[in-house]
Amino acid sequence: GSCGITEQMRAKGYEIPSYSQIRSAFRAEQELLTTKAEQGFKTFLLVPFGMSIADLTKIYGDALKKHKTENKLFAEADPAVPYDLNVEKPVDAWTGYQTEEISYFSKQFDQTNHGGLTKAQVIQESGAWQAVLIEDIPIPRAGVGATLGTKKPRKQLEAKKSPNAYLELLKDPQYEGEEGLTPELWLYKALTRLEEQNQVTDDWQGKGSISYNLGAYFP
């Protein structure tokens, strides 16, 4: 597995799902997944949600430093421009992600009535490995999002909205079946992009944007 992730998950008792298990799960949602694919969700990821955010952050940080050492680390906006990595802090993330209690997939950002799940509850309900389809990241800048899909058109979400605004937008039928990114998904997505394209993700100090990761809320 990438950077030993599969082995670490196996050590926790989380065996990677078989191809037939993933295919069966996707068949059960075939109509919805076909619609989402037409709407631009074409990247498949098998996310090791059962790993801790701290472990995933370290794996991603180590991978960034390795790429930098090998002169294979480039900017998000331009794959020809070398990226100036802060090797002392390769992953710039709020420390609360590793220390605070997280509510996953909250229905609303309300401290007493968020309707979210703990990590253990998510694993119990849907497993420690999450098979997901994601759209191109980052999302378009404000005012330039396209409408994709013929049978069920979907307007791409655009940058420069608040977390509450995005959460409200996801209630619209055109965004059926969609959820915000979790930190675990973001880290694995960023790691995958790094290994495949040698590029960083969401470089907010450059030409990228901060990712809100709506799938995680701190009540």
Set out the residue ranges of the language-model regions.
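Short, well-ordered surface patches within globular domains
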Residues: 182-188, 192
